[in-house]
């Protein structure tokens, strides 16, 4: 999964005991929009429902706010809405804890059920404030993504219905009996809806049972975390539902011992889920959305723990940062969002939301089409052309286009704060390519090397992202340069987006990768990155030069080109991992050079061989595509050198030259011509020779792994597995 909106955070401060080990922590770049949503729902609740402490002890924290860390890849334009929804849920939950009879469960649940079924919630003058808030929130979400907004309302209604059971007194016989009830009571269904809406995910209905099964450890870990930290807040409630209380009663122990039991269970469930994420991402029998959902949900686990350690909701007296204090005292009208949305697409059909959720009018803000002045429920005028990001939008015609009124055009020309165009267009070709199936071989190589190098998770993640961007960019450019119609059995990127957009997207990834390299902890990492990038371009230049001029290189020249081109990425990731390793002063990257060279050479020669001999490869890339491209593969070089050295094959040499010239003129070869070339290769036994070289290199790779295991004093099973996967 590509991470567009978040960065890795060192979680050692928040989890010194390592309870969430194996699960990273990420922070959303647009976290300020969460605060705006939270303070907006607080203002609406006080106006429409009743008194509320200020600031409210909900999702916000002085350093870590809930959604910013638990949904780090939420589409930015949806972040304020799900923040509003979450704190609405917290406020309603607090009412249930204090007095379930006065919490209006049937009214709220009925409103949400109607919203889930019809896409709207009926309201009138006599409607409760909670119903009005739910109705307005649903309208905002429907404007962004109708299908997922209705799914959210439906799942939230199920959670509210379950909360009604809290009035029942329960005599739990065991923790395992308590857990299923509490997991549902936790607000899991509401949270499921928020995440799928926020990240624009739809898990297929036929995978629902599998989704619940895979997610179970994460839900349990979050439930136990919630109960652990909320115990002090809830222990004096009328009807507390808390694991600490249950454990104390069942085990007949004190608070501290019960809390340790909670921590132990959290550690176990986190370890389970970390393994589930890893296994799920490697599966090929489930949808991409289910994979994405399971991967995203791991941040609910780590983010929930980090938030719980410092949030005012669980810690008294609560701490707030300065901006939160100002917004609590003066309102979000005076202190609006500081984050400027780059894009306003709804994630479904690329439709732009107009003002959407960011109106500053409180609960009755409008979409502001045509820039008309509207009145809210209290009769106060508001200008719908001002959104939550604090800038005026240009006047719009009824068709939603820029006004051509002279004053408006001049105002636009003088406006230095126009919204950014965003990177959505430049990323489209890249996102298409990365959505195609991939074996993730380079990620496997990084993880295998880390068995020895112990690189911190932040640097490891950055290197993986960097290598992915470079590899994807090179594939996009290679397909253009080689005129390849297929990539992984799908149309190549340039076939869909055109050469110009694909080149622009690919080069943008190079700039992104450079930025990532500059952010690595070792200052030498950027120099390593630039050195290897230069080698990649030089290697590619020879490949293109030989193809364009129909010049057959020697085996020596071919291998050197492979070292710089294909082997370059393996060498780069190896050198970067060594540079970022805590023991880099004791490890010379030269010690790993033979391995990276061998992998690069084996990988390329294997690719050459499969292009000519594998039916699956033909399905993925086209029949004997290297001959269409005019590439001088290892097998073709051997064939040419063999016929040139054998006078008995003079006629085959003439035919081979004729085919290569024809390919250059026509831009490809017919299947009949390709079959003739394969026939010549059969006579020279070039495929057999290539297979023999591959098997010899395989043995050398295995010996090199053994040598390195001796050097590092540790067996490396992931590396051996990776090498074994390459066998032909």
UniProtKB/Swiss-Prot annotation:
<dbReference type="Pfam" id="PF19086">
    <property type="entry name" value="Terpene_syn_C_2"/>
</dbReference>
<dbReference type="GO" id="GO:0046872">
    <property type="term" value="F:metal ion binding"/>
</dbReference>
<dbReference type="InterPro" id="IPR008949">
    <property type="entry name" value="Isoprenoid_synthase_dom_sf"/>
</dbReference>
<feature type="binding site">
    <location>
        <position position="478"/>
    </location>
    <ligand>
        <name>Mg(2+) 4</name>
    </ligand>
</feature>
<feature type="binding site">
    <location>
        <position position="604"/>
    </location>
    <ligand>
        <name>dimethylallyl diphosphate</name>
    </ligand>
</feature>
<feature type="short sequence motif" description="DDXXD 1">
    <location>
        <begin position="93"/>
        <end position="97"/>
    </location>
</feature>
<feature type="binding site">
    <location>
        <begin position="230"/>
        <end position="234"/>
    </location>
    <ligand>
        <name>substrate</name>
    </ligand>
</feature>
<keyword id="KW-0808">Transferase</keyword>
<feature type="binding site">
    <location>
        <position position="97"/>
    </location>
    <ligand>
        <name>Mg(2+) 1</name>
    </ligand>
</feature>
<feature type="short sequence motif" description="NSE/DTE">
    <location>
        <begin position="226"/>
        <end position="234"/>
    </location>
</feature>
<keyword id="KW-0511">Multifunctional enzyme</keyword>
<dbReference type="GO" id="GO:0016829">
    <property type="term" value="F:lyase activity"/>
</dbReference>
<feature type="binding site">
    <location>
        <position position="226"/>
    </location>
    <ligand>
        <name>substrate</name>
    </ligand>
</feature>
<feature type="binding site">
    <location>
        <position position="566"/>
    </location>
    <ligand>
        <name>dimethylallyl diphosphate</name>
    </ligand>
</feature>
<dbReference type="GO" id="GO:0016114">
    <property type="term" value="P:terpenoid biosynthetic process"/>
</dbReference>
<feature type="binding site">
    <location>
        <position position="93"/>
    </location>
    <ligand>
        <name>Mg(2+) 2</name>
    </ligand>
</feature>
<feature type="binding site">
    <location>
        <position position="93"/>
    </location>
    <ligand>
        <name>substrate</name>
    </ligand>
</feature>
<dbReference type="GO" id="GO:0046165">
    <property type="term" value="P:alcohol biosynthetic process"/>
</dbReference>
<feature type="binding site">
    <location>
        <position position="482"/>
    </location>
    <ligand>
        <name>Mg(2+) 3</name>
    </ligand>
</feature>
<feature type="compositionally biased region" description="Low complexity">
    <location>
        <begin position="362"/>
        <end position="371"/>
    </location>
</feature>
<feature type="binding site">
    <location>
        <position position="611"/>
    </location>
    <ligand>
        <name>dimethylallyl diphosphate</name>
    </ligand>
</feature>
<feature type="region of interest" description="Disordered">
    <location>
        <begin position="362"/>
        <end position="394"/>
    </location>
</feature>
<feature type="short sequence motif" description="DDXXD 2">
    <location>
        <begin position="478"/>
        <end position="482"/>
    </location>
</feature>
<feature type="binding site">
    <location>
        <position position="565"/>
    </location>
    <ligand>
        <name>dimethylallyl diphosphate</name>
    </ligand>
</feature>
<feature type="region of interest" description="(7Z)-ophiobola-7,19-dien-3-ol synthase">
    <location>
        <begin position="1"/>
        <end position="322"/>
    </location>
</feature>
<feature type="binding site">
    <location>
        <position position="631"/>
    </location>
    <ligand>
        <name>dimethylallyl diphosphate</name>
    </ligand>
</feature>
<feature type="binding site">
    <location>
        <position position="439"/>
    </location>
    <ligand>
        <name>isopentenyl diphosphate</name>
    </ligand>
</feature>
<comment type="similarity">
    <text>In the C-terminal section; belongs to the FPP/GGPP synthase family.</text>
</comment>
<feature type="binding site">
    <location>
        <position position="442"/>
    </location>
    <ligand>
        <name>isopentenyl diphosphate</name>
    </ligand>
</feature>
<protein>
    <recommendedName>
        <fullName>Ophiobolin F synthase oblA</fullName>
        <ecNumber>4.2.3.145</ecNumber>
        <ecNumber>2.5.1.29</ecNumber>
        <ecNumber>2.5.1.81</ecNumber>
    </recommendedName>
</protein>
<feature type="binding site">
    <location>
        <position position="488"/>
    </location>
    <ligand>
        <name>isopentenyl diphosphate</name>
    </ligand>
</feature>
<feature type="binding site">
    <location>
        <begin position="313"/>
        <end position="314"/>
    </location>
    <ligand>
        <name>substrate</name>
    </ligand>
</feature>
<comment type="similarity">
    <text>In the N-terminal section; belongs to the terpene synthase family.</text>
</comment>
<keyword id="KW-0479">Metal-binding</keyword>
<keyword id="KW-0460">Magnesium</keyword>
<feature type="binding site">
    <location>
        <position position="97"/>
    </location>
    <ligand>
        <name>Mg(2+) 2</name>
    </ligand>
</feature>
<comment type="function">
    <text>Bifunctional sesterterpene synthase; part of the gene cluster that mediates the biosynthesis of the sesterterpenes ophiobolins, fungal phytotoxins with potential anti-cancer activities. The first step of the pathway is performed by the sesterterpene synthase oblA that possesses both prenyl transferase and terpene cyclase activity, converting isopentenyl diphosphate and dimethylallyl diphosphate into geranylfarnesyl diphosphate (GFPP) and further converting GFPP into ophiobolin F, respectively. Other sesterterpenoids (C(25) terpenoids) are found as minor products of oblA.</text>
</comment>
<feature type="binding site">
    <location>
        <position position="482"/>
    </location>
    <ligand>
        <name>Mg(2+) 4</name>
    </ligand>
</feature>
<feature type="region of interest" description="Geranylfarnesyl diphosphate synthase">
    <location>
        <begin position="323"/>
        <end position="728"/>
    </location>
</feature>
<feature type="binding site">
    <location>
        <position position="471"/>
    </location>
    <ligand>
        <name>isopentenyl diphosphate</name>
    </ligand>
</feature>
<comment type="pathway">
    <text>Secondary metabolite biosynthesis; terpenoid biosynthesis.</text>
</comment>
<feature type="binding site">
    <location>
        <position position="478"/>
    </location>
    <ligand>
        <name>Mg(2+) 3</name>
    </ligand>
</feature>
């Amino acid at each position: 999964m590509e991470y567009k909106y978040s960065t890795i955070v060192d979680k050692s401060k928040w989890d010194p005991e390592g309870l969430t080990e194996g699960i990273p922590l990420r922070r959303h770049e647009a976290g300020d929009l969460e605060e705006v949503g939270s303070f907006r729902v607080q203002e609406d609740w006080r106006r429409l429902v009743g008194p509320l402490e200020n600031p409210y002890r909900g999702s916000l924290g002085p350093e870590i706010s809930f959604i910013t860390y638990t949904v780090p890849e939420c589409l930015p334009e949806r972040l304020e809405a799900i923040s509003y929804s979450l704190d609405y849920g917290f406020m309603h939950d607090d009412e249930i804890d204090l007095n379930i009879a006065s919490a209006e469960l049937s009214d709220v649940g009925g409103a949400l059920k109607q919203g889930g079924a019809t896409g709207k919630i009926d309201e009138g003058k006599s409607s409760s404030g909670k119903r009005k808030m739910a109705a307005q929130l649903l309208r905002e979400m429907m404007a962004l993504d109708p299908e997922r907004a209705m799914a959210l309302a439906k799942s939230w209604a199920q959670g509210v219905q379950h909360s009604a059971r809290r009035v029942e007194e329960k005599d739990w016989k065991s923790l395992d009996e308590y857990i299923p009830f509490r997991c549902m009571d936790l607000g899991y269904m509401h949270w499921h809806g928020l995440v799928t809406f926020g990240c624009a995910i739809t898990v297929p209905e036929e995978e629902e049972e599998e989704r619940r099964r895979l997610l179970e450890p994460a839900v349990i870990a979050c439930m136990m975390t919630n109960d652990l930290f909320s115990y002090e807040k809830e222990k004096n409630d009328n009807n507390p539902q808390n694991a600490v209380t249950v454990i104390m009663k069942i085990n007949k122990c004190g608070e501290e011992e019960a809390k340790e039991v909670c921590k132990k269970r959290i550690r176990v469930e986190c370890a389970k889920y970390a393994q589930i994420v890893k296994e799920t991402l490697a599966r090929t029998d489930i949808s991409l959305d289910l994979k994405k959902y399971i991967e995203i949900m791991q941040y609910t686990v780590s983010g929930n723990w980090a938030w719980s350690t410092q949030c005012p909701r669980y810690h008294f007296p609560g701490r707030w940062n300065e901006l939160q204090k100002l917004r609590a005292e003066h309102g979000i009208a005076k202190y609006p969002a500081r984050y400027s949305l780059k894009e306003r697409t709804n994630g479904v059909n690329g439709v732009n939301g107009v003002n959407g959720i960011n109106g500053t009018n409180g609960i009755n803000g409008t979409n502001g089409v045509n820039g008309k002045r509207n009145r809210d429920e209290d009769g106060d005028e508001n200008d719908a052309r001002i959104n939550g990001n604090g800038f005026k939008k240009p006047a719009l015609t009824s068709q939603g286009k820029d006004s051509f009124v002279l004053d408006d055009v001049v105002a636009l020309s003088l406006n230095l704060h126009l919204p950014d165009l965003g990177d959505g267009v430049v990323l489209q070709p890249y996102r298409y390519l990365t959505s195609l199936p991939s074996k993730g071989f380079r990620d496997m190589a990084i993880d295998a090397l880390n068995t020895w190098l112990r690189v911190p998770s932040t640097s490891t993640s950055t290197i993986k992202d960097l290598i992915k961007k470079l590899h994807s960019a090179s594939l996009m450019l290679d397909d253009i340069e080689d005129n390849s119609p297929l990539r992984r059995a799908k149309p190549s990127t340039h076939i869909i987006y055109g050469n110009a957009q694909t080149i622009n997207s690919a080069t943008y990834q190079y700039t992104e990768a450079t930025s990532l390299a500059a952010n690595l902890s070792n200052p030498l990492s950027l120099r390593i990155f630039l050195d290897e990038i230069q080698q990649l371009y030089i290697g590619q230049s020879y490949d293109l030069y030989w193809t364009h001029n129909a010049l057959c290189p020697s085996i020596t020249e071919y291998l050197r080109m492979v070292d710089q081109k294909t082997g370059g990425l393996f060498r780069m990731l190896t050198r970067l991992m060594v540079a970022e390793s805590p023991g880099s002063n004791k490890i010379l990257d030269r010690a790993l050079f033979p391995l990276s060279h061998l992998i690069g050479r084996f990988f390329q020669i294997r690719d050459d061989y499969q292009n000519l001999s594998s039916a699956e490869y033909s399905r993925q890339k086209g029949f004997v595509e290297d001959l269409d491209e005019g590439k001088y593969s290892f097998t073709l070089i051997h064939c040419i050198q063999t016929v040139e050295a054998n006078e008995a094959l003079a006629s085959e040499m003439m035919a081979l030259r004729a085919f290569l010239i024809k390919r250059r003129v026509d831009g490809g070869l017919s299947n009949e011509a390709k079959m003739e070339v394969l026939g010549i290769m059969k006579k020279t036994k070039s495929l057999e020779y290539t297979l023999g070289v591959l098997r010899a290199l395989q043995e050398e790779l295995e010996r090199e792994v053994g040598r390195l295991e001796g050097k590092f004093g540790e067996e490396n099973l992931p590396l051996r597995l990776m090498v074994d996967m390459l066998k032909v």
